[in-house]
Amino acid sequence: MKDILNALYHQKDLNDGEVKKLFTLIIHEKVSPVQLGAILCALKIKGESFKEISVAATTLLEHAPKPFNSGLDLIDNCGTGGDGLKTINISTIAALIASSMGLPMAKHGSRSVSSHSGSADLLENLGVNIEMNPMQLENCFKQTHFGFLFAPLYHQSFKKSAPLRKELFTKTIFNCLGPLINPLRPKIQLLGVYDKSLCKTMALALKALGVKRAMVVNGGGTDEIVLHDITHACELKNNKILEYDLSAKDFDLPPYDLKELQIENAKESVQACLDILENKGKDSHTMVVVANVASLLYLSHKAKDLKEGVNMTLEHLKTKAPYVHLQKIIRLSHA
């Protein structure tokens, strides 16, 4: 531990063995709160490398139970959170719609830290059992193409270190790790990050973890694809990383103001979700979700480009099938 701390104090990247040792100790609660605080802050100041992030994620996954084997190339659109802008739950609503279109969505998430409503909060408030046992989860997924994996059930180190991390008043490597440690190990990911500078780092981490296809995005300071501003993207395709910017024009959608996406409380988030699924949501809410679903369709080769993905999603919403789909998820999550 002393060698690890000294390396970080001198702003040196840790090698793979040191990262694996460090996170194994963290998992087994062999690191004191003072040491953990020092390590997280030193990593933050140095800047976490993609190798440190990917090896830490691999170590955490090795200690996380895998609830079932699907035999599919699963998809996740879990983001880092932490943008503090208190918008509707874009990625969670997008995951519900995408799964109703047949995409195999394994949604990894937790409760809110910086927003009014995290993915777990929204789903729970909608009536979904977010703490499904492995049998319930597999059954729900097989019948709906949607499964929610509540992070604290699979990663105790996150849960136990949460009070300390909260007292640091800064984002740490744990924020980056959240979207990378889905126990079902999805092969396709749409991953939002709270800072544009993380896009390339996280894309490299996904590549190192063996993800086949991904897009890491930051849209106007949010960890989502947005229509009110430029979305910076790093796309992992054919084992190469392509870096580019997206705007509303790339989706053939109109721009909307960020303020229209912001909410005052969790109740508003629930209502926004239900309205979108029933195809009666505000245009600003619906269209930003549609852009994110379109990106999932593109990444999974169901749409040839983003504009086709948008048209497919808009046509699907007209059927109101996503709302019926949600009711089925709610019922099966409690079965």
Curated annotation (Swiss-Prot):
InterPro entries: Anthranilate_Pribosyl_Tfrase, Glycosyl_Trfase_fam3, Glycosyl_Trfase_fam3_N_dom, Glycosyl_Trfase_fam3_N_dom_sf, Nuc_phospho_transferase. Binds 2 magnesium ions per monomer. Keywords: Amino-acid biosynthesis, Aromatic amino acid biosynthesis, Glycosyltransferase, Magnesium, Metal-binding, Transferase, Tryptophan biosynthesis. Its cofactor is Mg(2+). 5-phospho-alpha-D-ribose 1-diphosphate binds at residues 79, 82-83, 87, 89-92, 107-115, 119. Transmembrane segments: none annotated. It comes from the Bacteria. Anthranilate 2 binds at residue 165. The keyword Transmembrane does not apply. One of its GO terms (cellular component) is cytosol. GO terms for biological process: L-tryptophan biosynthetic process. GO terms for molecular function: anthranilate phosphoribosyltransferase activity; magnesium ion binding. It catalyses: N-(5-phospho-beta-D-ribosyl)anthranilate + diphosphate = 5-phospho-alpha-D-ribose 1-diphosphate + anthranilate. Pathway: Amino-acid biosynthesis; L-tryptophan biosynthesis; L-tryptophan from chorismate: step 2/5. Mg(2+) 1 binds at residues 91, 224. The keyword Glycosyltransferase applies. It is an enzyme of class 2 (transferase). Its EC number is 2.4.2.18. Homodimer. Belongs to the anthranilate phosphoribosyltransferase family. Catalyzes the transfer of the phosphoribosyl group of 5-phosphorylribose-1-pyrophosphate (PRPP) to anthranilate to yield N-(5'-phosphoribosyl)-anthranilate (PRA). NCBIfam families: trpD. This is Anthranilate phosphoribosyltransferase.
